Amino acid sequence: MGIQGLLQFIQEASEPVNVKKYKGQAVAVDTYCWLHKGAIACAEKLAKGEPTDRYVGFCMKFVNMLLSYGVKPILIFDGCTLPSKKEVERSRRERRQSNLLKGKQLLREGKVSEARDCFARSINITHAMAHKVIKAARALGVDCLVAPYEADAQLAYLNKAGIVQAVITEDSDLLAFGCKKVILKMDQFGNGLEVDQARLGMCKQLGDVFTEEKFRYMCILSGCDYLASLRGIGLAKACKVLRLANNPDIVKVIKKIGHYLRMNITVPEDYITGFIRANNTFLYQLVFDPIQRKLVPLNAYGDDVNPETLTYAGQYVGDSVALQIALGNRDVNTFEQIDDYSPDTMPAHSRSHSWNEKAGQKPPGTNSIWHKNYCPRLEVNSVSHAPQLKEKPSTLGLKQVISTKGLNLPRKSCVLKRPRNEALAEDDLLSQYSSVSKKIKENGCGDGTSPNSSKMSKSCPDSGTAHKTDAHTPSKMRNKFATFLQRRNEESGAVVVPGTRSRFFCSSQDFDNFIPKKESGQPLNETVATGKATTSLLGALDCPDTEGHKPVDANGTHNLSSQIPGNAAVSPEDEAQSSETSKLLGAMSPPSLGTLRSCFSWSGTLREFSRTPSPSASTTLQQFRRKSDPPACLPEASAVVTDRCDSKSEMLGETSQPLHELGCSSRSQESMDSSCGLNTSSLSQPSSRDSGSEESDCNNKSLDNQGEQNSKQHLPHFSKKDGLRRNKVPGLCRSSSMDSFSTTKIKPLVPARVSGLSKKSGSMQTRKHHDVENKPGLQTKISELWKNFGFKKDSEKLPSCKKPLSPVKDNIQLTPETEDEIFNKPECVRAQRAIFH
């Protein structure tokens, strides 16, 4: 169908266009193209003979689209079979029939997809199907016309006569018929390709020498529906022949086609005859004139043309019969009457197709083509209004000031602002966004004293040691602990971001000067104050009279300070600080015994140890010092305890215990714990590390003065530099952190004990200089290390009052609730069972 490859050959003359371009104008539509597309969707039903009208809806979709754009569509349908195409139509009919039979056979075999393809190729659009579309289009007021023979010639006639301004089709033969404007491949949105006859000269292959006649010759030579082409001749070679030939006689040119193309081609006489008939069919095919309502040739006959010899281009019938065929009232094959539509008695109803269209208003070209006063073009109305435009006076050279007050121009709506309420002052407005604590502070400052200063004056009697508070600190806090933490942060200059502080993951600088939680316990039947000042202080506040605890006098204080080397005398300023700390920690409730007897517990302090001696802890311990002197114990027991302390000091990384220890120990144990607890106090700063920071736990666990002397023997072998900072984070295991200036201690190997615990050697020395390792005399030799490494053959003889060493009891780390000798006392059998069983 059509001329193969014509659209690509003339693509320079085509341009994309939307059908809205023809708004207010009339376009003719080759409806059979829409019918073929719509029938493919229901090809299976049509092949089976089942009733369907999906193709009608498909065609009406395009019709409604054109009406929505303001374009008047005129639907054109094919009529009778043209005598020139009988051979072509017969071959097409046979091909459709074979596809139908093949599809039915495939459907029986169960090959549905292949059968559907065969059904799509076997579609035959009948006049009954076209009549359904005609009725549906008439219901919308759309004009329909059935061509006497082919719709292509009828479309070309309407376009050339000016009844329609463009033609919508899928067939390229319309260009050979001489159509002015053709819209090809239009989609459901109105987009397509427009080929204008006036732009055919833009094609480089055609050139300027081509005319409408030569273009038609080229289409016939390349092959069309009316004549098959010669073997090996297409559009390109046909165009070349017509460009080279200067002879106006086309018959002579066809005979010499082999000469022009330099090919061995023999042109038969039948081809020349067929060429002449095809050319006459393109020129003189019969069409119907809807305005005159009669059959007319596409082009007027020439002087040398006999109409009686052009029967292959269509046979004449009566005008009345042709009118009934054009209206669709008669069948094109049998000429039977199938409808009685009359455009004169049944005028088309005027219907609006857009919101902007007014009732009774008819745009140009919307009247029916069956009316005698049909105005096909817009130029008719524009010409009638032309004289009125000339009557208006010319404004050329005139100057006038134009005012726009009377014009209804689009402008922004006036937005009225609500009046400002002047009753509310700026101070009142700012006070709404200020906190209540700030107002309280302002009131306090107006009296001459700030709340923070008054509070601090109560807690700190000495102005020299009073802590400085920030002016922006609110006076009212949720609890005392929050106030204390905030004051410590302000003193240390730490930057606190709300919601981002973590008590577990932080640096040591962020938790300076923090006070630990109080800890107390009541193991078994009595409460004993332990080595830490915090535990002693809080235990005294909670139960001061338990088991005969009494404050000590000044002599006891002097004795305590004399027992601990490196401690200075207690000043009243330090006592003031201790009293302040005790008041702040007094509000905290001690945890129960079950809480203390757990694997994890809060550590003592987060406060940074200073290098200056602080006697505040000794002052605190004065009131808990026993007046009676502790009795001496066996030297063997003290040695064992000392060994245990040394072992534990190594296992814990030479760090002090975070929790206090409770137990049923002797008075000598309490005396030694309270005297040595000054080094690990969480409320005060530790003394200068004369006694060694790593030996603090050992001193706390000594049973008598002999244990204290054993611990003092190790003092010369350790560095006395004060660089060790210990920050105890609550809930985490304690780790020993040393100052960057301190050196690493060397722990030489000693003979191992039977229980598997190692004992510290008394000859272990600390390097006092960074270049000590390079001095030959002070270097440790491998031979000496091997001498020290070994096992003792003779086990120690234990006194009868003690039980033999146990690999289970001696290897476990003592809990904070128990002391060393709790396992050696017969009255503490219950505690042993509770711990080990």
From Swiss-Prot:
Sequence ranges of Polar residues compositional bias: 449-462, 556-565, 611-623, 665-690, 699-713
One GO process term, biological-process aspect: humoral immune response mediated by circulating immunoglobulin
EC main group: hydrolase
Modified residue annotations for N6-acetyllysine: K480
Keywords per UniProt: Acetylation, DNA damage, DNA excision, DNA repair, DNA-binding, Endonuclease, Excision nuclease, Exonuclease, Hydrolase, Immunity, Magnesium, Meiosis, Metal-binding, Nuclease, Nucleus, Phosphoprotein
Subcellular location: Nucleus
Region (Disordered) location: 345-367, 440-477, 555-589, 608-740
Pfam family, one: XPG_I
Textual note on the cofactor: Binds 2 magnesium ions per subunit. They probably participate in the reaction catalyzed by the enzyme. May bind an additional third magnesium ion after substrate binding.
Subunit (UniProt): Interacts with the MLH1-PMS2 heterodimer via MLH1. Interacts with MSH3. Interacts with the MSH2-MSH6 heterodimer via MSH2, and this interaction may increase the processivity of the 5'->3' exonuclease activity. Interacts with PCNA, and this interaction may both stimulate the cryptic 3'->5' exonuclease activity and suppress the 5'->3' exonuclease activity. Interacts with WRN, and this interaction stimulates both the 5'->3' exonuclease activity and cleavage of 5'-overhanging flap structures. Interacts with RECQL/RECQ1, and this interaction stimulates cleavage of 5'-overhanging flap structures.
Organs and tissues of expression: Highly expressed in the spleen and testis. Also expressed in the bone marrow, brain, lung, lymph node and thymus.
Residue numbers binding Mg(2+) 1: D30, D78, E150, D152
Protein name, UniProt field: Exonuclease 1
PANTHER family per UniProt: EXONUCLEASE 1 (PTHR11081:SF8), FLAP ENDONUCLEASE FAMILY MEMBER (PTHR11081)
EC number(s) from the headed UniProt entry: 3.1.-.-
Single Gene Ontology MF annotation: DNA binding
Region of interest (I-domain), residue spans: 138-229
